[in-house]
């Protein structure tokens, strides 16, 4: 338990709070005294995360969880009210919810999957920014942090939905930062590379793919949720008080090189024949999106 609490008296909401980045970010916030509410869709996951995090919380820091859908505006509003109660206001919000991994050639990507990637990675962040800004402004100002991806800057093939959503997210961060600056609400983003979390565990069973990622990282290792959490903590707190509208990479230097070759994952996902047909401009008939 920490005795130094620079975030004491501040309330925070983290969407996707039960996952790797969400819970790692929460740990650093509560360690520095913030009262944090984790939002997610699975109560058991949230309950276990809160139980683990209590061991690291500074004196007076409160931990809560709220079961709800971050892509639903009404549910999100309820979660924000819950997060504001312990500290008497909301000062920080972190948008972690997202999903990637379609590994499908563009000519085979169905509309439903594409739109779903936008909903989870972009619309969820839009809703959090829109819903969190008024209570943060009412509390005297604060910070909103979004989780982007190095896919926003690098052209990752076969991930059209995910890369489009993350690029859009960073544009949203800039627009929101400009509009909300008079309210003293800062909006920034962290841009991680590949991390080992419960959502990406299946990728770590692909040694050739991991080698592709490692070869493009000058620092020579993959990241952890704790690496990204350090960036979230900086952007959420007063240490970054003169920063807004920024998206910065925490990806081992990957943006200095290029995206990995993902042909193998796409072939595994759709099959060799379909992959080759799509890349030759003759994709199989698309599935019914209805």
Predicted ranges, named:
Residues 129, 165, 173:
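Active-site helix of classical SDR
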Residues 181, 186, 243-245:
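Short, small/polar-rich loop/turn modules that mediate ligand/substrate recognition or access, typified
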